[in-house]
Amino acid sequence: MIIRSPEPEVKILVDRDPIKTSFEEWAKPGHFSRTIAKGPDTTTWIWNLHADAHDFDSHTSDLEEISRKVFSAHFGQLSIIFLWLSGMYFHGARFSNYEAWLSDPTHIGPSAQVVWPIVGQEILNGDVGGGFRGIQITSGFFQIWRASGITSELQLYCTAIGALVFAALMLFAGWFHYHKAAPKLAWFQDVESMLNHHLAGLLGLGSLSWAGHQVHVSLPINQFLNAGVDPKEIPLPHEFILNRDLLAQLYPSFSEGATPFFTLNWSKYSEFLTFRGGLDPVTGGLWLTDIAHHHLAIAILFLIAGHMYRTNWGIGHGLKDILEAHKGPFTGQGHKGLYEILTTSWHAQLSLNLAMLGSLTIVVAHHMYSMPPYPYLATDYATQLSLFTHHMWIGGFLIVGAAAHAAIFMVRDYDPTNRYNDLLDRVLRHRDAIISHLNWVCIFLGFHSFGLYIHNDTMSALGRPQDMFSDTAIQLQPVFAQWIQNTHALAPGVTAPGETASTSLTWGGGELVAVGGKVALLPIPLGTADFLVHHIHAFTIHVTVLILLKGVLFARSSRLIPDKANLGFRFPCDGPGRGGTCQVSAWDHVFLGLFWMYNAISVVIFHFSWKMQSDVWGSISDQGVVTHITGGNFAQSSITINGWLRDFLWAQASQVIQSYGSSLSAYGLFFLGAHFVWAFSLMFLFSGRGYWQELIESIVWAHNKLKVAPATQPRALSIVQGRAVGVTHYLLGGIATTWAFFLARIIAVG
């Protein structure tokens, strides 16, 4: 840590009334660009309008103005999020069976949408139990509401109204901080203050307030609910907060107040701040007392972290010093210059944030099923499948976004003149070695992982099961994964002596937890089948990384096109008269990377869906016999390609294909429609611009003949636009098809 003399007092960091509020200007399409504001000559205008409306770099080169626009847009985004949340809570209050579900969550399904009868679509209102007819929801909101202590629809109404107020407040803030008091560039670049406030405020105080809410409101209410008390009889949240005796009845140490805290006798609080591990056998979720303890601990960590960086007081860390001190044996100048990059290029900053947030989202996907945080979440199979799938897709998109903005940084913000021998420069100088090695890894993984399957298909086809790679013939056990599982299963009593069970039942060792005759979670066995599919995961992830990383490292120049930086972020080819240079722009790498991301995530969610139905989810008899949904067929069926097609895709598609005439029929229609959207994408991906321009010319001729030709000249989509429309429909169609396939299946059998 470096101690410096105190910095001078902070200057005024906002400009007052920098930009007047003008509805006339906003009403003019394309007001942000001189060219677009002139109005349309050809139909390309509408595409440019959409492409550039939020590309603030193209409106101005002034970093301060760009920063203000981004900052203001963030408030608009928050406003939309609050509006969406309000809608969710309003549906829970107005159209749902939340109170009925709360009284019997094992026999009643969650529903918060009732279809109006107009042309007979009231068939979609299925019987979710308890005499309620509606669409079964799979968002997990009911489980979150119960965990947070919401016991009535009135409370949901109040929260919905509160969220609307916050949405309005955010809209106002977005306007205020752009038009009335806009921060100066120095404010956006003050990273130490930003770290202190975000760490201590958002993460520290945010976690502390949630921990407080859990201890004072959620825990007592959930205690009553678990004991079978009628929600209407449970005291209201404010009564627990105002009346300490109420809490002391449930947790006797409450009667001592804060004395144990100040006398360091903290173990007194272990009634409601526990360290148990495992799942609550009543609800099948993590112990809420463990969760409260966790948030308190997280709050302490982040409150400390939020006091580590040097601001007005001249003590603490400076980010620039930390980065410049970071030198390794092979990294030359190390991280020198990174501080300047990250405070002047928001694309570089965004790229890092997207990569980390995307990875974190995928981590969330894996924890939601292995450590289900909310009561009755683990036995709601449709919600479990939806949450996993949703977080996997989101994580995949965020990581591709990270590569996109890294490439935009390389093209627009990277200045090679003052970058010499730092980490980034050294990576760029040996990019050929990086990419060619990564390419070799992809080829190796592809041939070997796929080869194992092809071997099995061949042996199976020739009737030689004894020569297949399987748990019953030639075993390829995932020994490292099994070792990790075993280590975690043994942790309680050894490395974590206070714990009564391991972090997740999936590690093994523990008993299974069942709620209402359904399996919540049990130890997940790993075998040859998992070994095979995990190497497909490795393959698809490495190919995605290869495409995206090549796009970033060759964004400015390559042997093929040395002056690529001058062509910009997206361009179709290197001009006329230079063949073989199409699909080389940084944008095209993002475009191609999206397809492999889709590949990678698809295999993951298919693996998860089948594995859970085969080895985890199912019912348990009074004698303790578990019957899994697909009867444990994963280990023997998923070791051939044919098995995936026959026993997963085809066998489990029967519910969506046969859904017509039932309450699941909407999924049947979506399955059909989304296939159509996906197929529609191929029209854009497999045909060239000239074909369409030729067609358009003859259609225009017909319009002229009939004297109905428009003033705006029709143009075919540009090559890049066609690819953008193609990949959008490809992903939308593919994801919606999977959604319909998964939900019709799991709602029917789960």
Curated annotation (Swiss-Prot):
Q: Which family does it belong to?
A: Belongs to the PsaA/PsaB family.
Bilayer-spanning residue ranges: 70-93, 156-179, 195-219, 291-309, 346-369, 385-411, 433-455, 531-549, 589-610, 664-686, 724-744
Q: What is this protein called?
A: Photosystem I P700 chlorophyll a apoprotein A1
Explain the purpose of this protein.
Answer: PsaA and PsaB bind P700, the primary electron donor of photosystem I (PSI), as well as the electron acceptors A0, A1 and FX. PSI is a plastocyanin-ferredoxin oxidoreductase, converting photonic excitation into a charge separation, which transfers an electron from the donor P700 chlorophyll pair to the spectroscopically characterized acceptors A0, A1, FX, FA and FB in turn. Oxidized P700 is reduced on the lumenal side of the thylakoid membrane by plastocyanin.
Domain of life of the organism encoding this protein: Eukaryota
Chief location bin: plastid
Gene3D superfamilies hit by this protein: Photosystem I PsaA/PsaB (1.20.1130.10)
Entry binding sites for phylloquinone:
W692
EC number(s) on file: 1.97.1.12
- Tell me the organism's taxonomic lineage: Eukaryota, Viridiplantae, Streptophyta, Embryophyta, Tracheophyta
Q: Which PANTHER family match?
A: OUTER MEMBRANE PROTEIN, OMPA-RELATED, PHOTOSYSTEM I P700 CHLOROPHYLL A APOPROTEIN A1-RELATED
The record describes how the cofactor is bound as:
P700 is a chlorophyll a/chlorophyll a' dimer, A0 is one or more chlorophyll a, A1 is one or both phylloquinones and FX is a shared 4Fe-4S iron-sulfur center.
Q: Which GO terms describe its biological process?
A: photosynthesis
One Pfam match: PsaA_PsaB
Which Gene Ontology molecular function entries are recorded, alphabetically? 4 iron, 4 sulfur cluster binding; chlorophyll binding; electron transfer activity; magnesium ion binding; oxidoreductase activity
